[in-house]
Design a protein with these regions (language model features):
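Acidic, metal/ion-coordinating pockets
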Residues: 2-385
């Protein structure tokens, strides 16, 4: 016989309900913790995939009250020193009417196109400064028509590598041979220099180069004869450069009488006019020989550096040349007047009986002789002034 089932009391029912509720609460709590843990893991993965890796660039230092940064960097009014080197006539080529086994082109072929051959002896000097400037005299072109004149010089466009291989950064084209092959040759020369990173300038083309944060203006002028018109073009360019914010203005002039060791009155008049107009330095070439120098209003005028890497003559009678170097101190728009200059004696050739087209620094007795020669020329200028 089966026992009769009994009915649960209210107390038992209440206990069962409490137990069920507690179990449900525990389950929800465990589920919430698991979900939170999963959410954190997902957030870390997303952050790792979207946040870029830190760079080595430090945060910019905060500016201090004195116009300086907290790191100690000065404002632009701090003095900046820069060294600029100048060399003379670079005729990288030959007149086709005088081509022979001793010509510049023949030397290029003998060196199998090694552009470093020509300026090898001065490359270290040029590489140690902040800017090197030469006179590029002749056309670098395969085209154009030869001018009807006694000497017209042309070289291959690739000859521009001769300059760039020795840290020559700029070249004036204001001279009597840059247009020996017309406008085509002139334009090709500019393009050839541009391709090698050599800044050309001259006539109405004023070049502006940034050297250690200093805006330098390079002005090239050609004086086929002493004239007020040439002087005005030069001084107008100087004024324009100043208006453009140039801090240092350099003028490279092609002037004077060929093969004359003494300057003309016109050279001095024009050179001093350039200084009066605001130039900080005037250097010159064209006579094919070195001339003297003077200081006017605290600025240097170096009248002729002579030839340099000169393909215009297989054996020049006078192989002496000069490299001029000046270190400028620029503070804002002010250029200090100083005598931090160097007149470096050199020769256009490593041989005395022929032109090797490889300028070399003079040493020993040769250096002393050239130094004395330049000083004597400077003394004559001073005596006549």
């Amino acid at each position: 016989m089966y026992a009769k089932p009994t009915c649960p009391t209210p107390l038992k029912i209440l206990l069962v309900v409490v137990i069920v509720v507690e179990l449900a609460a525990i389950g929800l709590l465990l589920a919430g913790r698991a979900g939170a843990s999963e959410g954190r893991d997902s957030a870390v993965e997303a952050s790792a995939s979207t946040t870029p890796a830190p760079t080595d660039t430090p945060a910019a230092p905060a500016a201090s009250d004195g116009g300086e940064t907290a790191g100690g960097d000065k404002a632009s009014s701090e003095p900046v020193t820069l060294t600029v080197t100048f060399a003379g006539d670079c005729t990288l080529g030959t007149d086709i009417n005088y081509e022979n086994e001793r010509s510049f082109n023949s030397r290029w072929q003998a060196e199998e196109g090694d552009a470093t051959y020509f300026l090898r002896n001065v490359a270290d000097l040029f590489g140690s400064d902040d800017l090197t400037v030469v006179n590029m005299e002749g056309a670098l072109t395969e085209g154009g028509e030869r001018a009807d004149k006694k000497f017209a010089f042309r070289g291959k466009p690739e000859y521009a590598k001769i300059l760039s291989s020795a840290s020559v950064e700029a070249a004036t084209l204001a001279n009597n041979h840059s247009q020996d092959y017309g406008q085509t040759g002139y334009d090709d020369t500019i393009a050839a220099l541009d391709a090698e990173g050599v800044q050309s300038f001259g006539y109405d083309r004023v070049a502006y180069v940034d050297v250690k944060g200093v805006k330098v203006a390079l002005i090239g002028s050609y004086f086929p004869e002493d004239s007020a018109e040439n002087t005005k073009e030069m001084t107008d360019n100087i004024a324009a450069a100043r208006a453009e914010g140039a801090q240092l203005v350099i003028v490279y002039v092609h002037w004077g009488q060929e093969h004359e060791y003494d300057i003309t009155e016109g050279q001095q008049t024009a050179g001093r006019a350039a200084i009066d107009a605001g130039a900080d330095l005037v250097v010159g070439s064209h006579p094919h020989v070195v001339q003297g120098w003077e200081v006017y209003q605290g600025r240097y005028l170096v009248y002729s550096l002579g030839n340099f890497c000169f393909g215009g003559n297989t054996n020049p009678d006078d192989k002496d040349c000069l490299i001029f170097q000046q270190t400028f101190t620029v503070t804002g728009d002010e250029v200090a007047k100083n005598d931090d200059v160097d007149f470096i004696a050199a020769s256009v050739s490593t041989e005395t009986d022929r032109n090797t087209y490889q300028p070399v620094l003079a040493e020993g007795d040769e250096k002393a002789r050239i130094d004395a020669k330049v000083q004597e020329a400077a003394d004559r200028i001073a005596a006549a002034s």
